[in-house]
Each structure stands twice: as structure tokens, then as C-alpha cells.
Regions:
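Terminal connector regions
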Residues: 285, 290-304, 308-310
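Polysaccharide-binding surfaces and accessory modules of carbohydrate-active proteins
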Residues: 25-38, 45-248, 264
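Bacterial N-terminal signal peptides that target proteins for export
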Residues: 2-11
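The substrate-binding groove and active-site-proximal loops of carbohydrate-active enzymes
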Residues: 316-325
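Conserved small/polar residues in nucleotide/adenosyl-binding loops
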Residues: 326-332
């Protein structure tokens, strides 16, 4: 018979609480006005808790305790019912993945005025590794996220699906805004309420990846999109090749958004020790409607994507279609 006195009981409870706190690590990724909260328990599944406007420390604690948790990067093979971000064929032919957290690295990029957070994952069985990377710009309300995939298996591993990122959007009166069109009719705004089923925006043209559609979307969370009011999430894939954006709406409480390289006819054989880096997905959030998201994307692009983006420059107006050739006809005399 084991007798435990109050002092020993208090010690055991303290050790248990300490081990729980150490194993259930939460990560906060912030820009000046937005925030992404993740749960990254060592040896467990990385989960997204919240993405939206920046909150207080008290709200963060409350969210971490009560939030609905979604896998931060769902993979194929262990009963996940929705669309997955990553699927592979291992060297032995197996299709199963089960990724768990093995580490977290947070770095301050002083010269770039950004922070870099890397969630390190490893498969439970295979020497297969995925890093989920988050770069939060401190001079623009944009978080870029991408993945870095590698392995140490004896033979090449075939990557069959390799999305850059996954974002769960809570179901409700959510509307999607995106651009579509054709030659001489490009950039037409399409707005629609998200319904059950799959919504896919993709491109397979290679060199004309912005003529019929664009790899940028906005989610209006408060009903029909408004220009200056309402909560909006913006997402833009930073990639000039074939892309695919998927929105999977099933019987649960979420719209499952995934974006990345279009894997159709493009499976990749990843060699041992080779690193496959996916293109970044840029995310932003605004409670000032679509224009608020647009302004944040423009600021981020000027500061970090365009050469000399804040420098005024002359623009050549190409107006030959609007002017028409008849206006250029010389007098016959």
C-alpha cells in the first residue's frame, strides 16, 4: 500500500502541471494589427487556434483555452476526411503520413523588419520532415507562410500534393471574391456565397497564369462583400506558375482553404536530403472591408515585392485599343 502525504501530492501535481505547460506550447505570430495563434505541443499535432485582428494577452489566454482547433497543415493517410495539404508516396510505396511537432524556432530578422517562426515536423515512422514557416512583416500587416519538405529515406519520395498553406475559415455567411475573365475581358470581379462542396480556382496555362483567373482571393466573413466595412481575410499566392486554390466545405463548421502549386501532372520525385520549398502564401486581415485588405497588400508589395516600390516613376499609357487606328490616319492631302 502506497501512502502519499500532502507534501508529496503537491509535488506530484506541480510536476504534472509543469510538464503539461512545457508540452502544450502556444505560438503567437503578430503584425502591427493582425495575429495568428498556434498550438504546437511537442510530439503532437500542430493546430491553428485563431487568425484575425490583434488581441490582448488576456484574450490570447482565453482563445488558447477555448478555441476550436484545426490541424495547421493536414496531411494524407490517417483518416483526415477533408482535403489535405500534403500527400506523398514513400520509397516503400506507402502513402501514409503522420506528422508531429519536434521543435519550434523563432528568429527576429532585424534588417527585413520581420519575424520568422518555423514549426518543425517529423513523421512518426519515416525519416520525413516538414517545416511550416511563417514570416510576419512588422511594417505591413501581412504574414507569409510556406513549407520546406525533405526526407532521409533510401530512395526518392514522390510528392503528389504539396500545398503552400492551409487556412480554416469559420462557416457562416461567408462570401468569396476572386477575379476571372478571358482575352480582352480580363480581371472581372466574381463574388459568391460559399456553399457546401468544392470550389477550385486553378491555372494550367503556365505562362498565362493571370488571364483567365488569379491566385488571389478575399473572404468576407460578414455577408456580401462591402468596400469599406466588414471583416475580410485576404490571401495571395506568390507564384508565377500553375497554381491551384481549393475551398472544401463539408458537413463540419469550416471552409477549408488550401493554396499552392497545381500538382496535376506535376508530381515531384524528391531526392534524399533535397529540400523542396513551396511558394509563399501571403495572408492579411482587415475589419475595414475589401479596401482595407487591398491597402495592406499594396503596402506590403511596395515595401517588399517591387523594386523601388515607393519611388514615383513615369508610366507609358498603352491606349492603342481605346484610341483606335482611325484617329491616327493622316490627311490625304
Amino acid at each position: 500500500m502506497i501512502i502519499i502525504n500532502k507534501r508529496n501530492l503537491f509535488f506530484l501535481i506541480s510536476v504534472w502541471l509543469l510538464s503539461t505547460l512545457l508540452s502544450a506550447q502556444n505560438v503567437t505570430i503578430s503584425t502591427p494589427q493582425t495575429q495568428l495563434l498556434l498550438s504546437v505541443p511537442n510530439g503532437g499535432t500542430p493546430e491553428q487556434l485563431y487568425y484575425g485582428s490583434r488581441t490582448s494577452d488576456a484574450d490570447i489566454r482565453s482563445i488558447c483555452e477555448t478555441a476550436c482547433r484545426r490541424n495547421a497543415y493536414p496531411v494524407y493517410g490517417m483518416g483526415y476526411p477533408c482535403e489535405t495539404a500534403l500527400s506523398v508516396r514513400h520509397a516503400d510505396g506507402n502513402l501514409t503520413l503522420q506528422m508531429v511537432v519536434i521543435g519550434v524556432k523563432e528568429t527576429r530578422l532585424t534588417k527585413e523588419n520581420a519575424t520568422l517562426t518555423v514549426i518543425e515536423l517529423k513523421d512518426k515512422v519515416y525519416p520525413f520532415f516538414v517545416n511550416i514557416c511563417y514570416k510576419a512583416w512588422q511594417d505591413a500587416d501581412v504574414i507569409e507562410t510556406w513549407t520546406e519538405i525533405r526526407h532521409e529515406e533510401k530512395k526518392p519520395v514522390q510528392l503528389q500534393q504539396f500545398a503552400s498553406a492551409y487556412l480554416p475559415v469559420r462557416r457562416g455567411n461567408v462570401w468569396l471574391s476572386h477575379l476571372s475573365g478571358a482575352w480582352a475581358n480580363e480581371g472581372q470581379l466574381c463574388q459568391e456565397a460559399l456553399q457546401p462542396g468544392m470550389k477550385v480556382i486553378k491555372n494550367t496555362d503556365g505562362v498565362r497564369n493571370s488571364q483567365s483567373a488569379h491566385a488571389e482571393v478575399m473572404f468576407s466573413l460578414d455577408g456580401k462583400p462591402q468596400e469599406n466595412t466588414g471583416r475580410v481575410i485576404g490571401a495571395a499566392l506568390c507564384y508565377s506558375g500553375n497554381y491551384k486554390l481549393r475551398i472544401d466545405t463539408q458537413e463540419d463548421d469550416w471552409h477549408h482553404f488550401l493554396a499552392g502549386i497545381n500538382e496535376e501532372n506535376s508530381w515531384y520525385n524528391l531526392k534524399k536530403e533535397e529540400v523542396f520549398r513551396t511558394p509563399a502564401l501571403a495572408l492579411t486581415y482587415s475589419d475595414e472591408g475589401m479596401s482595407g485588405c487591398s491597402r495592406k497588400f499594396h503596402q506590403w508589395a511596395r515595401l517588399h515585392k517591387l523594386a523601388n516600390g515607393n519611388t514615383p516613376r513615369k508610366i507609358l499609357l498603352n491606349s492603342w485599343e481605346a484610341v483606335s487606328y482611325t484617329h491616327l490616319t493622316l490627311p490625304t492631302n
